[in-house]
Every structure is written in structure tokens, then in C-alpha cells.
Amino acid sequence: LALECFRIPHFYRAFYVYKYATGLSAAIALSQRVLTGGADELADYLGFLQGGCSEDPLDLLRNAGVDMEQPQAVDTALAHFGHLVDQLDDLL
């Protein structure tokens, strides 16, 4: 039991949890583009999916309209989270 913490990769793998946050930020930014955009944004998203592993993930995301090297994707995710918190607050 004393070494139980070594079984959980969240504690010892560099950037393990960071991957969740960046993936979620990218997904929210992509979905917001599709839901609020038009045919071009949908085509960008489908192109992202069709890209598979053909390019670097950052390049695929950038081509789909989400630049993970800029703060907008994280800002979009934080705004979405804030909206969800407001909805929860209204329910409570």
C-alpha cells in the first residue's frame, strides 16, 4: 500500500493530465466552430477527421481552424465551462 501511488500514471508521467486539458480545449473549439459556423466550418472539421495521422496533430487542428499555439482555444473552453457552471448554478 505504501507504493500504491506508483500504480497511477497521473502522478509520475510528465504532462499526463495536461493531455486531457489540451484535448478537451481542442474538441470544444472544434465543436463550437461547427455548431456556430456554416458549411465551410463543417468542411474544415471533416477534413480534420479525414486527415487521420497524415500530418502533425497541431497542423491538422490549425487547418481545421483551431490553432492550439494561440490562447483562443483555451479561452473558448474556459468560456464554455463558465457557461456550464452558470447553468448548474441556475439549477441549484
Model-derived features with residue positions:
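C-terminal, non-catalytic "cap/extension" segments appended to globular domains
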Residues: 1-92
